[in-house]
């Protein structure tokens, strides 16, 4: 039985997207799919177009899914926050949370690129300030 879960809304320039997780979250094949509604009639099932997978495993990262979207403090960058696995084997013990900047294609669709490996450095968001987060004792 197919599994689709964790829908997240993404809007840009009047376009409406729903990004969702597909497959079992414990598997290497967990990925993100995308629904696009080009005409705004959200209650009409025929108005939605399905695309996917739009963010999926690589040879270093597996089980990519369950995301959220945020903007940088200056509102100029779009970021995706997502889970991934560092091993191919089924299970949840190797699941991590990652953040990555993403772009928009010339077609108006989000372009998430490839998921980052566990140890990949990332540039901080634009106009972010270094912060110290106190750790609980």
Model-derived regions: residue spans:
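Carbohydrate-active catalytic/glycan-binding domains of CAZyme proteins
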Residues: 1-137
């Amino acid at each position: 039985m197919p599994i689709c879960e964790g829908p997240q809304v993404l809007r840009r320039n009047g376009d409406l997207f729903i990004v969702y997780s597909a497959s079992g979250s414990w598997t290497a094949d967990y990925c993100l799919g995308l629904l696009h509604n080009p005409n705004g009639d959200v209650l009409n099932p025929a108005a939605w177009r399905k695309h996917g997978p739009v963010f999926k495993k690589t040879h270093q990262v597996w089980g990519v899914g369950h995301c959220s979207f945020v903007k940088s403090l200056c509102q100029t960058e779009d970021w995706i926050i997502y889970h991934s696995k560092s091993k191919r084997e089924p299970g949840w013990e190797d699941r991590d949370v990652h953040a990555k900047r993403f772009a928009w294609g010339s077609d108006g669709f989000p372009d998430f690129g490839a998921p980052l490996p566990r140890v990949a450095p990332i540039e901080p968001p634009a106009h972010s300030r270094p912060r110290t987060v106190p750790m609980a004792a």
